[in-house]
């Protein structure tokens, strides 16, 4: 349940991104870090996010990403050069139609919506 809660929270963020730009459905995502090696977590994420997942083929992806962003920030690289500098990624999970997971996500969304007032009214 804890892992599903994390996956559903990530889906909420992804839905906000998708809603902000309807032209780009964000159908593929890249994973990095320790969790990206566990096939059960990858599949849960793919199913919950409704996206294909690709694992970054780089053991220090977070450090590399930070260095690339810093390089852009100081003008060493232009943003459009990042694609060529990004490490390769291998497909690791495709989303499945998991009706039981979808039902649990619907409950999560409903319960989360009920708590919204706690954060907007200070109750």
Label each residue range with its predicted role.
Residues 1-123:
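Glycine/Thr-rich phosphate-binding loops that ligate phosphate moieties of nucleotide
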């Amino acid at each position: 349940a804890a892992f599903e809660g994390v996956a559903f929270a990530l889906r909420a963020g992804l839905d906000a991104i998708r809603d902000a730009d309807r032209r780009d459905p964000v159908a593929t995502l890249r994973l990095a870090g320790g969790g990206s090696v566990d096939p059960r977590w990858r599949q849960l994420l793919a199913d919950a996010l409704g996206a294909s997942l690709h694992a970054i083929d780089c053991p220090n992806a977070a450090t590399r990403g930070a260095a690339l962003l810093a390089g852009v920030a100081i003008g060493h690289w232009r943003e459009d050069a990042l694609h060529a500098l990004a490490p390769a990624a291998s497909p690791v999970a495709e989303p499945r139609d998991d009706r039981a997971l979808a039902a649990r996500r619907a409950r999560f969304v409903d319960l989360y919506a009920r708590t919204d007032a706690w954060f907007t009214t200070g109750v």
